[in-house]
Swiss-Prot record:
Assembly and oligomerization: Interacts with the Sec translocase complex via SecD. Specifically interacts with transmembrane segments of nascent integral membrane proteins during membrane integration.
Coiled coil: none
Native organism: Vibrio parahaemolyticus serotype O3:K6 (strain RIMD 2210633)
PANTHER family the UniProt entry points to: CYTOCHROME C OXIDASE ASSEMBLY PROTEIN COX18, MITOCHONDRIAL, OXA1
Compartments where located: Cell inner membrane
Keywords: Cell inner membrane, Cell membrane, Chaperone, Membrane, Protein transport, Transmembrane, Transmembrane helix, Transport
Matches recorded under NCBIfam families: PRK01318.1-1, PRK01318.1-3, yidC_nterm, yidC_oxa1_cterm
Name of the gene this protein is made from: yidC
Entry GO MF terms: membrane insertase activity
Official protein name in the record: Membrane protein insertase YidC
Record-level GO cellular component terms: plasma membrane
Predominant place of localization: membrane
CDD domains referenced in this protein's UniProt entry, alphabetically: 5TM_YidC_Alb3, EcYidC-like_peri
C-alpha cells in the first residue's frame, strides 16, 4: 500500500463522484413524488389546477405596473391581478463590477418567472386569466423611507357589492413579504373564496456549466417531507397534488444561490400543487375556502420569499425553508462546516482567508487520521521484503499465502487496511466541504486578493489551478512508492495534469481550498516522515 497511489486514487474518485453527482442533479434531480403525495395525508387532495383555465386565453394586457422599493428589493407589481412581475435584489449585482442589480423575477419576451396570487372559489375573481381584477392604487411608486421599518402597499377593487383590498407588506432588510387580502362582503349574499399563490416559470434545462451544473426547478416541503425537489421534467410527467393536513409547508422555485417561495398561513387542508400549461410550469399552494356572510369581512394571507438563499433568515420565515440550500446527503456535516466558515469570516472579513483558516482547522482535526495512515503505510513498506520472500516460497497457493500473511500482520502488529481506512473516513468531510462552498451565496462575487475578484467564479488566469496541480506533483514526488508497473507509473504521473484540467473550470473558492489542503498535506507529510524515521520506520 503506497501513499501516492492511495491519495491520488481517492482524490480522483472524489472528483469523479462530485462531477457525477452534479450531473445527476441537473439531469434527474428528483424521483417522482407519487409516494410522498399519497402519504402526506389520508385526506384526498383535489387538484387546484382544475379550478383555473385549463388552457388560458389571451393574457390581459397590463393596465400599468407600480414600483415598490425597500433597502433590499425593488418590485414591479401588475395592477391587473396584483402579481409580482419583476424583482430586483438591490444588494446583489447581476455581474461582477456591474451596477445593475440581480433580477430574480421578470416577465420579458421569451422568459417568464413571476409570483402570482389571487382569489378563487365559487365567487372567485381570479378564475380566468383573461378577466382578472383591475386594482386601483394611490400612487405609481412606493418607497420605504429612512427611519421606516414597514411599507404597506394597498390595492383596491370593488365588484358586485364586494370590496377587495390586496396589500403587500414589506419590511426593512427582509426578503420575505406578506400578501394580504381583506374582503368585505356587502353583496346581500354569502360569498365563498379561497386564496391561491404560485410561482410560474418557463420550463427550461438545469443551469450551470458542464463541469459545474446546478439545479433549477421546483421544490416543496410538507409535514411528511422536509424537503424535496420537483423538477420541470417531473411537472411535465405528472401534476403534483398534496393535501397539507396541518397546513404547514411551502412551494418554491429554486436556482443556484437564489429562490422564490410561497408559504401558506398554516391552514389545514391547504393544497400544494403543480401544473404545466404549454411551456410554463406552476408550483404553489391553494388555501381552503372561507364563506363570508353578507355584512362580514374575512382575511386571506400568505408569505412570499424572493431573494438569496440565506439560511438563517429563511429558517425564521418557515420550517425547513433553509433546506433549499441543498448540501446533499452529507448535510449534517456540511451545515456545521458552513456555520464555522461564516463564523471565521465574521472575524477575518474575507471569505478567501476564511476558507484558508477553515482548511487548516479541518486538516488539523484530521491529523491523527493522517498520521495513522502514514504510519501504517510505513509499517507495510517495512514488511515488503518478508512478503516478497513469502511469495517466492509459497508460489501460487493463494489460501496458504493469505493465511501466512495474516499471521505475519498479527505478529508485527500491522493493520493492512490502516493506510486506506483514514482516507475513506476523510472522504465524507471533503465532499461535505465541497458542497458547503458550492452552495454558499456568500461567496458569490466575494473577492480574495489580487486577481481573484470572485470566489464563486473560475480563476480568470488559471493561476490557482496550476498551483494546485504543482502541489499535487510535489506530493507525488515526496511520497515513496512501490509501484513498478510502467503503465501504473504513467497513470500516476498523468493524474496531476488531469486534475489541473478539471480544476481550470471550478470556482476559485473550491480550488483555493484544494490548493491549501495540498500545502497542509505537504507540511504534515514532511513532519510525519521525519518522526517515523526517528522511530526506525523507513519511509523510502
Amino acid at each position: 500500500m503506497d501513499s501516492q497511489r492511495n491519495i491520488l486514487l481517492i482524490a480522483l474518485a472524489l472528483v469523479s463522484f462530485l462531477l457525477f453527482q452534479q450531473w445527476q442533479v441537473a439531469k434527474n434531480p428528483a424521483p417522482q413524488a407519487v409516494e410522498q403525495a399519497q402519504s402526506s395525508s389520508s385526506l384526498p387532495a383535489p387538484s387546484f389546477a382544475d379550478e383555473l383555465d385549463p388552457v388560458p386565453g389571451q393574457q390581459q394586457a397590463s393596465a400599468k405596473t407600480i414600483t415598490v422599493t425597500t433597502d433590499v428589493l425593488t418590485l414591479s407589481i401588475d395592477t391587473v391581478g396584483g402579481d409580482v412581475v419583476h424583482a430586483d435584489l438591490n444588494q446583489y449585482s447581476a455581474e461582477l463590477d456591474s451596477s445593475d442589480p440581480f433580477v430574480l423575477l421578470k416577465d420579458t419576451q421569451g422568459h417568464q418567472f413571476i409570483a402570482q396570487s389571487g382569489l378563487v372559489g365559487p365567487q372567485g375573481i381570479d378564475l380566468s386569466s383573461s378577466n382578472r381584477p383591475h386594482y386601483n392604487v394611490s400612487a405609481d411608486s412606493f418607497t420605504l423611507a429612512d427611519g421606516q421599518d414597514e411599507l404597506r402597499v394597498p390595492m383596491t377593487f370593488t365588484a358586485n357589492g364586494i370590496e377587495y383590498t390586496k396589500t403587500y407588506v414589506l419590511k426593512r432588510g427582509s426578503y420575505a413579504l406578506n400578501v394580504e387580502y381583506d374582503v368585505a362582503n356587502n353583496s346581500g349574499n354569502n360569498a365563498t373564496f379561497g386564496m391561491y399563490a404560485h410561482l410560474r416559470q418557463n420550463l427550461m434545462d438545469a443551469g450551470g456549466s458542464i463541469t459545474m451544473p446546478t439545479y433549477r426547478g421546483g421544490a416543496y416541503s410538507t409535514e411528511d417531507t422536509r424537503y424535496k425537489k420537483y423538477s420541470f421534467e417531473d411537472m411535465q410527467d405528472r401534476n403534483l397534488s398534496i393535501n397539507l393536513a396541518d397546513g404547514q409547508g411551502w412551494a418554491a422555485m429554486i436556482q443556484h444561490y437564489f429562490a422564490a417561495a410561497w408559504i401558506p398561513r398554516n391552514e389545514p387542508g391547504t393544497n400544494l400543487y403543480t401544473r404545466v400549461i404549454g411551456n410554463l410550469g406552476d408550483i404553489g399552494v391553494r388555501m381552503p375556502n372561507k364563506t363570508i356572510a353578507t355584512g362580514d369581512q374575512a382575511k386571506f394571507e400568505a408569505t412570499l420569499w424572493v431573494g438569496p438563499k440565506l439560511q438563517q433568515e429563511m429558517a425564521a420565515v418557515a420550517p425547513n425553508l433553509d433546506l433549499v440550500v441543498d448540501y446533499g446527503w452529507l448535510w449534517f456535516i456540511a451545515k456545521p462546516l458552513h456555520s464555522l466558515l461564516a463564523f471565521i469570516q465574521s472575524f477575518v472579513g474575507n471569505w478567501g482567508v476564511a476558507i484558508i483558516c477553515l482548511t487548516f482547522i479541518v486538516r488539523g482535526a484530521m491529523y491523527p487520521l493522517t498520521k495513522a495512515q502514514y504510519t501504517s503505510m510505513a509499517k507495510m513498506r517495512m514488511l515488503q521484503p518478508k512478503l516478497q520472500a513469502m511469495r517466492e516460497r509459497i508460489g501460487d497457493d493463494r489460501q496458504r499465502m493469505s493465511q501466512e500473511m495474516m499471521e505475519l500482520y498479527k505478529k508485527e502488529k500491522v493493520n493492512p487496511l490502516g493506510g486506506c481506512l483514514p482516507l475513506v473516513l476523510q472522504m465524507p468531510i471533503f465532499i461535505a466541504l465541497y458542497w458547503a462552498l458550492m452552495e454558499s451565496v456568500e461567496l458569490r462575487h466575494s473577492p480574495f486578493f489580487g486577481w481573484i475578484h470572485d470566489l464563486s467564479a473560475q480563476d480568470p488566469y488559471y493561476i490557482l489551478p496550476l498551483l494546485m496541480g504543482a502541489s499535487m506533483f510535489l506530493i507525488q514526488k515526496m511520497s515513496p512508492t512501490t509501484v513498478t508497473d510502467p503503465m501504473q507509473q504513467k497513470i500516476m504521473t498523468f493524474m496531476p495534469v488531469m486534475f489541473t484540467f478539471f480544476f481550470l473550470f471550478f470556482p476559485s473558492g473550491l480550488v483555493l481550498y484544494w490548493l491549501v489542503s495540498n500545502i497542509v498535506t505537504l507540511i504534515q507529510q514532511t513532519l510525519i516522515y521525519k518522526a517515523l524515521e526517528k522511530k526506525g520506520l523507513h519511509t523510502k
